[in-house]
Amino acid sequence: MKNAEARWPKESTMEKLEEMRYGTRGAILRYGEQILAVGRECRGFHAAVYEMVETPEETGFADIECRLNLVEAATELFEDGGHAMAWCMAHI
């Protein structure tokens, strides 16, 4: 199993996370300036919290194109997406 840092890129955008299929097999949600990300793999769900380092107001880009930095990634896998998202909510 990959470690948490290898699973989630340190820098990304919501659009790139979607392209990595986290959005189609999990969820990518903006919560203020935080991005809650849940992805699925064959053994379970994983989770990460990102923070926006650019805003649409600063860049003129859509929020999905703004740069993100990884804040924290769960080291464990979860039984379902709800538990993974609950982990994200507890870590913002």
Where do the language-model regions lie?
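Short beta-strand segments and strand-loop junctions that repeat across beta-rich extracellular domains
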Residues: 48-62, 78
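Amphipathic, interaction-prone secondary-structure segments
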Residues: 25-52
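Short arginine-rich
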Residues: 90-92
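A short, exposed loop/beta-hairpin motif centered on an aromatic-Gly-Thr core
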Residues: 61-81
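Negatively charged, low-complexity tracts enriched in Asp/Glu with abundant Ser/Thr
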Residues: 2-35
